[in-house]
Every structure is written in structure tokens, then in C-alpha cells.
Amino acid sequence: MEDDVTTTERLPAPPLDTASKRVGFISLGCPKALVDSERILTQLRAEGYEVAPSYEGADAVIVNTCGFITPAVEESLSAIGEALDATGKVIVTGCLGERPEKIMERHPKVAAITGSEAVDDVMGHVRELLPIDQGAFTGLLPVAAPGMRAGVETPQRENTRHGDVFAPSVKLTPRHYAYVKVAEGCNHTCAFCIIPKLRGLQVSRDAGAVLYEAYRLIAGGTKELMIIAQDTSAYGVDLRYRESEFQGEQVRAHLTDLAVKLGEMGAWVRMHYVYPYPHVDRVVELMAQGKVLPYLDIPLQHASPKILKLMRRPGAGKQLDTIRRWREICPELVIRSTFIVGFPGETEEDFQELLQFLEDARLDRVGAFPYSDIEEADANALPGAVPEEVKQERLARFMEVAQRISTEKLSEKVGRVMDVIIDEFNDDEDDQPGTRLIGRTKGDAPGIDGQVYLYAGDFAGLVKIGDIVRARIEDSDEYDLFGEVIEKPEWKPNVPQLGHFGKH
């Protein structure tokens, strides 16, 4: 889609340099943008560019921006300005790049602007700004994923709306978890959202490509996979669920088929951005069987049928029945969701309906945001704007209920023994190294949910970041758990552990 990529006037090519060049990188926005950053970094490394850890010594900087809500736009513009001040050579990519006039108005000296998911375009600008002899670096391209059928020497490049890309082998997350993006773009027309305008309609990856990426990650030591898309439950719709090869079998591009195969690999598999479609029941059954983590991240947004209709959101009036059915299938299911309060037209009656839904559904993890206009969103034109002070008052009331429910639900876990994946150490100065740990249960995603604060006890110094331990929960508060390690079982995935992304 040519119209989706806008660039400034191309700079004249400098003379070829055989020395390696250093590129700084700033990644902003959601996990889906993080995966785009990983793809760009993978290609930079493959072509022989060094990634600078700071502005100092960077020959140019790439800024992967967010352009969704106003604060994110401002953060992106500020980051671009900071990078320009530091290096003078900045390539802008990501969602805000789909609105180049906004960038050029503030920063006319940027070297180039591309849209989102534009690896090839970004790399073209990097080569123009910082040409190097790439002949010596062809061996750094990603090699075949372990488990590929005989005769396949390199992973297939996948088509995107801006060209084709490799699945990333450079990760920006800690080694023990990774985001796996199964689709780009969105087919929904939510009144408050502009993602389809920024990232286009949904484009799903073939199931084989996703599964080979997951296999390679687990072979390299990744223990937790976060499956993401704008609408993960709609994965494969645009492909008409076509089949593709994985280890000699044909696998449909469908969420349930993908979940079955991912579950067979033995890692933690966590589902994000899931809409309550009927086939999600089958995924919940896999959760009950222990094949997929009993966790669903569902963006419900509201509970009033009137407001959901104004938002152009699906599922009005059926949300509670769906949640009850899922919990009957999998009693251990943890549900997280986000909501918007103060949407145009929201009355006190609508808000009370939302609060009652929260009481009835007793969601485990909840986030909420006051509505704010987003440039180009259809909701901006709706009548019945809610005053800012009313939005904030409703937000406070909403979060008070959500916090109480969270406190009650977490208190039910006290006394239980739970699996916890370790994310970091939390030692005091006088502690033996590895005495205090911070991790997450199967019901907690990194960065957005609660944590578990653990005392290692007899296992002090024996537990590493990324280990999965058994812990007895001894206390809780509004959002977090506290306990002690009682066992450190060996992790045994169903994927050969190579310690690197090499050929099996």
C-alpha cells in the first residue's frame, strides 16, 4: 500500500564505508509496536549495523512511535526532538508515521518518515544515511528454526502491507518471555479507535510461520509466549483459515488450531486481546486441560448496551453470560479487561450499569481510562460530552469497586501453592544474593498485572531469573501476592533446548 508510507525528500547517498555504523533505537507504544521494533533490530543486526545503547556514539536514531492517544503522540514527538538534538539524524517509523504532517510541523529536520510495520522502508533509509559494506554480514541472517522439515535452510519471509519480513530473532523482552504477533491491523470500526487508519485492516500470518517462531523461541530458552494482535480471536479470518506447513503437518490459521499446537510445546502460552467469539470456548477448554494458561485479556470497554452501541462494540448484553460459561469450563480462569468511563452520551444510569456489571462479573484484573478525544476518531462528533470532572469522579468510583474486588479475589489465594515465573531479584543490601524475588503467577501478564513477592528461603542463590518455582502464598494486598519458595522443579518443554537459534 503505497499511500501508507510517506517519506521526506531522500538525502544524497554518502560514500560507501566499510566500518560498522551505530544506530540508536527508541521503541514506544504497545507490545505490537515492540514486535515491529524487534523486527527492525533483527534486520539491522543482520546487515551489520551495531545497535547503540544510548545517544552517545550513535550515528543515527530510529524512533518507533505511537500515534493512538494524545499523550502518546506528545511522548513520541518529544522523543523525536530529543533524538534530533542528540544526533541530528532521525528516522521516524510506527503509528505516528502514518500522520507525517504532524511530525513535520514540529520536527521538519527528520531524515525520513515511514508508517507502521515498515521494516524494508526503514532499512532503505538506514542504508542511505549510513551506507556500509554488507557483504561480510550475510551469515547473520536468521537460520532455520529447529524442527523445520529437511531441506528448509532459512525461515520464510512473510508478506506484510509494507513488504516482507523475517520473524524477529532480536528480542527486547527478557529472555524468558516473548511477544508473538499473529496478525497486524484490525477489521473493527470502533468509534473511539483509529487503529485501522494507522495500521490498516487485519493481515494474519500463516500458522506455520507463527509456530516455527514459537518453536525457535522455546528452543532458545523462552518459557512464556504472549500471543498478541489487535483482535487475536479473529486470527486467520482474512486468510479464510488456510492451512500451512509445520513439521510436516498442515495447520489451519485459526485461533483454536494455533492454541492446540502451541500448547503441545510445553511453554506458558498467554492469550491477549481476545474478543468473546463462540470459538473462544474451545480455547478455554484447552485452559482447563492445562495446555494454555488460564488467562484471557478481553477489552470489554463498557457494559451498557446503549454505550456499547455508540462505541460500535460487539457483544452488548451477552458479556456476563459468556464470562459465567467460561468459568464453568475453567474455574481457574483469570480475566483481565479494560474499560472507558465518561464516553459521550454516558449517563449516571449507564455508569451504574457498568458498576453493577463489575460487581456481577468479578473480573480479576481491571484497568480503566477516562474518555478523551482522539484525532480522526468518529466518537469525537458524538453528542453528550461528559464534563471532565464527572469523568474523573466516575473513574475514581469505578476503580474503588475494582480494587475491592481485586483485594477479595487475591485473598482467596492465600494458603495455596502456585507456580511463579521469576522476573527479577529484589534483595536488600544485607541479603544473600537471590534471597528476595519478584515474579508472576499464571494469572499475571508482565507490565500490566500484579506481582508475587517471594522469600527464597532454602533456595536463596539457587533461583535464576526466568525460573518457574513453586511458592506458598502467605499474604496479599490490593494487587499483589506475597509468599515463599518451596520447590524449584526442572522445566521440561517439549522442544529441544539449544540455547541459541540454531539448526536442529
UniProtKB/Swiss-Prot annotation:
MF terms (GO), sorted A to Z: 4 iron, 4 sulfur cluster binding; aspartic acid methylthiotransferase activity; metal ion binding; protein methylthiotransferase activity
Cofactor(s) needed for function: [4Fe-4S] cluster
InterPro entries: Elp3/MiaA/NifB-like_rSAM, Methylthiotransferase, Methylthiotransferase_CS, Methylthiotransferase_N, Methylthiotransferase_N_sf, NA-bd_OB-fold, Ribosomal_uS12_MeSTrfase_RimO, rSAM
GO cellular component, one term: cytosol
Enzyme Commission number(s) from the entry: 2.8.4.4
PROSITE patterns referenced in this protein's UniProt entry, alphabetically: MTTASE_N, MTTASE_RADICAL, RADICAL_SAM, TRAM
Keywords of this entry: 4Fe-4S, Cytoplasm, Iron, Iron-sulfur, Metal-binding, S-adenosyl-L-methionine, Transferase
Disulfide bond annotation, renumbered to this chain: none
Transmembrane segments: none
Localization annotation: Cytoplasm
TRAM domain ranges (all copies): 411-487
UniProt binding sites for [4Fe-4S] cluster 1: C30, C66, C95
The keyword Secreted appears for this protein: no
Binding site for [4Fe-4S] cluster 2: C186, C190, C193
Function field: Catalyzes the methylthiolation of an aspartic acid residue of ribosomal protein uS12.
Protein name: Ribosomal protein uS12 methylthiotransferase RimO
Protein's organism: Deinococcus radiodurans (strain ATCC 13939 / DSM 20539 / JCM 16871 / CCUG 27074 / LMG 4051 / NBRC 15346 / NCIMB 9279 / VKM B-1422 / R1)
